[in-house]
Curated annotation (Swiss-Prot):
<dbReference type="Pfam" id="PF00400">
    <property type="entry name" value="WD40"/>
</dbReference>
<feature type="region of interest" description="Disordered">
    <location>
        <begin position="290"/>
        <end position="314"/>
    </location>
</feature>
<feature type="region of interest" description="Disordered">
    <location>
        <begin position="554"/>
        <end position="596"/>
    </location>
</feature>
<dbReference type="Pfam" id="PF12937">
    <property type="entry name" value="F-box-like"/>
</dbReference>
<comment type="pathway">
    <text>Protein modification; protein ubiquitination.</text>
</comment>
<feature type="repeat" description="WD 6">
    <location>
        <begin position="623"/>
        <end position="662"/>
    </location>
</feature>
<feature type="repeat" description="WD 4">
    <location>
        <begin position="484"/>
        <end position="525"/>
    </location>
</feature>
<keyword id="KW-0677">Repeat</keyword>
<feature type="repeat" description="WD 7">
    <location>
        <begin position="665"/>
        <end position="696"/>
    </location>
</feature>
<keyword id="KW-0833">Ubl conjugation pathway</keyword>
<dbReference type="InterPro" id="IPR036047">
    <property type="entry name" value="F-box-like_dom_sf"/>
</dbReference>
<dbReference type="GO" id="GO:0000209">
    <property type="term" value="P:protein polyubiquitination"/>
</dbReference>
<dbReference type="InterPro" id="IPR051075">
    <property type="entry name" value="SCF_subunit_WD-repeat"/>
</dbReference>
<feature type="repeat" description="WD 1">
    <location>
        <begin position="365"/>
        <end position="402"/>
    </location>
</feature>
<keyword id="KW-0804">Transcription</keyword>
<feature type="compositionally biased region" description="Polar residues">
    <location>
        <begin position="55"/>
        <end position="69"/>
    </location>
</feature>
<dbReference type="GO" id="GO:0043130">
    <property type="term" value="F:ubiquitin binding"/>
</dbReference>
């Protein structure tokens, strides 16, 4: 070993690092390695003599630490630069050209996902606060230390994926536990990515559709991009589908149906726009747009050398066309509320239903007990034992008109946009133009008072004191009489889709009739008091298997004229509440004929409400809570509302049987109920109608 090499080793000092408290000293300068690793950095053919020293330095005197620093810097620069140039990824920064032609970027490698492309240099955006802090800490170090650290960063930055792994493995192998803990804490934040922004929008929407409303609202607060995705109609339309007019299977939360008035107004707006649309009266710019484009294109073909003036003219014309198109977008575009706002509105109403937050309006005007009512939008119709029908404005509480013509008390009524039909104890039904108060026609067919009626499409059914159900067909003017009950028929319900009718009677039974065969296809037994109401539930209503109670101890069902049989003996009954084929109702129901409503609810003077499955005749649930007979009943997919002799109104969950809320206020028995998505109305023998609105 010559003197020069010996003095160089002495300048470095020992190559062995010391350990303090199990950790390498953080104050040790970061210089180039000693003699043991000298050749690995410089290459096998390089020596110290090949490197020039600073002017004025001599090889004869000993090499101190300060005289060796310029040598190390030159050595580092001489060896780092080729490494950097050799390992720069071509797709990130191609080096020069080949044969005078630019270097072509290779096609994307489909074997790797977007996060693992070893052929590309990482373009991850730098974290500004972190880099500022790093820069300040670096500036506190000596210049030589800064250069050494910068060289290490440069080598790692230019290294390919395989080299980077080796470098990291070597570094972590020399780290102590505190340093490894620091790496773990730092990496935990660095590996977090904005996956919603990185993924295609379709996949992002799919992910967001699995979140609940609270999580979606929090996601919208992350960034502008997340807000745009989380507030998109794709996500909230799915949320509305899951919750509006039905109970969500995941969270058990259900929201009221959209306002029918709003739907009808939207439909009328579309029809009005379609009816008044005239092609000859298009907004300015629509008709001439294509002609302008065609002329500009033709001019450019005829005079390709016309110069900048023609080009500017074409640009001005195109700009004018675009601006005109933007101005005319509103002419064609229909304005819709964002689905998030729709959900927000319905959620507010649903919350008010849950906690009983509502406003109350009382309608007074009848001189005797109110026996029937119905409301739609801002119109309320009530029928009373004073033989009159009153039409009210629900928004102002004003009485609009009174319909007079019946000779006795009015027990039932129903109206739509064009007509109102009423049934009275004077044995007649009357058809009214409720907007003018004119009586259009009177139907006489029962030998007793008419206590129940319902029409759907062109079919009208009426129940009477004479123990019969009469069917009136408005289309072919035909009628038929259904006999089978042994006491008053208090309520009837028509389902025109399946061509069936339900009837409830004082003989404690409920019957299902086939209008094609004019026969009874099912009789439901279970109530021990006179059945006052029967209400089919909407087809959207779903009842879970695990919610079924054992209610068959005192329940039987008769199919047709056969003797009473247990539900398990019925055709098509498999012991489950899954969809039952139409054949369960008899041979008349083939695959092309819709089945009757799957579930019905009934109320009786035995103080109970029952939920039935029509295909099997099973009583799925009995609702207990009223102290006296239940006269009035209304239901939808979310709730059941009942009114009873005990002067109370109760709100029930049809799936659990739980009474969610009780309303009081009437001083007489509650005889009739009307139910909407955001309100309900009750009528009583105290001559009052009380309307509860939850849209506050």
């Amino acid at each position: 070993m010559d003197a020069h090499e010996l003095s160089f080793r002495d300048g470095h000092g020992s190559s062995t690092s010391t350990m303090k408290d199990g950790c390498a000293s953080a104050e040790k300068p970061h210089y180039l390695p000693g003699d043991s690793s000298f050749t690995s950095v410089f290459g096998p053919s390089e020596t110290v003599e090949d490197v020039e020293t600073e002017p004025g330095s001599t090889q004869d005197k000993p090499h101190s630490f300060n005289t060796q620093k310029p040598i190390r810097e030159n050595l580092a620069g001489k060896n780092v630069a080729p490494f950097l140039a050799r390992h720069i990824p071509e797709q990130y920064a191609p080096l020069g050209s080949q044969g005078g032609q630019p270097v072509e970027i290779s096609s994307a490698n489909s074997k790797y996902c977007y996060r693992h492309r070893p052929d590309l240099k990482c373009r991850r955006q730098a974290d500004e606060p972190t880099m500022d802090k790093l820069q300040r800490e670096l500036e506190t170090l000596p210049q030589s230390d800064q250069q050494g650290i910068a060289h290490a960063w440069s080598i790692f930055s230019a290294a390919p994926a395989k080299h980077r792994k080796l470098i990291l493995q070597g570094i972590m192998a020399q780290c102590c536990f505190p340093q490894l803990s620091f790496i773990s804490a730092t990496v935990r934040d660095l590996i977090r990515i904005d996956f919603l922004t990185a993924l295609p929008p379709e996949i992002s929407f799919k992910i967001l559709c699995y979140l609940d409303t609270t999580s979606l609202c929090k996601a919208a607060q992350v960034s502008r991009r997340w807000r745009a995705l989380a507030d998109d109609d794709v996500v909230w339309h799915r949320m509305c589908e899951q919750h509006i007019h039905r109970k969500c299977k995941k969270c058990g939360w259900g929201l009221p149906l959209l306002d029918r008035k709003r739907l009808r107004e939207s439909k009328r707006e579309i029809e009005r726009r379609a009816a008044t649309w005239d092609v000859s009266k298009q907004p300015a710019g629509i008709e001439g747009s294509s002609a302008t484009i065609e002329t500009a294109a033709a001019g450019s073909k005829r005079k390709p050398e016309s110069g900048k003036e023609d080009t500017a003219m074409v640009k001005r014309q195109c700009t004018s066309i675009v601006s005109q198109s933007e101005q005319n977008e509103d002419y064609f575009k229909t304005r819709y509320r964002p689905w998030k706002e729709v959900y927000k509105d319905r959620f507010k109403v649903g919350t008010n239903w849950k906690y009983g937050r509502c406003s109350t309006r009382v309608f007074k005007g009848h001189s005797n007990g109110i026996m029937c009512l119905q409301f739609e939008d801002n119109i309320l119709a009530t029928g009373s034992y004073d033989a009159t029908i009153k039409i009210w404005d629900t928004e102002t509480g004003e009485e609009l008109r009174t319909l007079k013509g019946h000779q006795s008390g009015i027990r039932c009524l129903q109206f739509d946009d064009t007509k109102l039909i009423s049934g009275s104890m004077d044995h007649t039904l009357k058809v009214w133009n409720w907007r003018t108060g004119e009586c259009i026609s009177t139907y006489s067919g029962h030998r007793g008072g008419v206590v129940g009626l319902h029409f759907d499409a062109t079919i009208l059914a009426s129940g009477s004191v004479d123990k019969t159900v009469k069917i009136w067909n408005f289309e072919d003017k035909s009628t038929c009489l259904l006999r089978g009950h042994t006491d008053w028929v208090n309520a009837v319900r028509v389902d025109s889709a399946s061509r069936t009718v339900f009837s409830a009677s004082d003989d404690c039974t409920v019957k299902l009739w086939d209008l094609d065969t004019k026969s009874c296809i099912r009789t439901f037994h279970g109530h021990v008091g006179q059945v006052q109401q029967v209400v089919p539930l909407p087809r959207e209503f779903e009842f879970e298997d695990h919610d079924v109670e054992c209610e068959n101890d005192n329940v039987s069902v008769t199919s047709g004229d056969s003797p009473a049989a247990s539900p398990q003996a019925l055709p098509g009954f498999d012991g489950q509440t899954s969809d039952t084929p139409s054949s369960a109702f008899g041979p008349a129901f083939d695959d092309g004929r819709p089945s009757p409503p799957r579930y019905i609810v009934t109320s009786a003077l035995d103080s109970t409400i029952r939920l039935w499955e029509t295909s099997s005749g099973r009583c799925l649930r009995t609702f207990f809570g009223h102290l006296e007979g239940v006269w009035a009943l209304a239901a939808d997919t979310l709730r059941i509302v009942s009114g009873a002799e005990d002067r109370m109104v109760k709100i029930w969950d049809p799936r659990t049987g739980k009474c969610e809320r009780t309303f009081t206020g009437h001083s007489g028995p509650v005889t009739c109920i009307g139910l909407g998505d955001s309100r309900f109305a009750t009528g009583s023998e105290d001559c009052e109608v009380r309307m509860y609105s939850f849209q506050t």
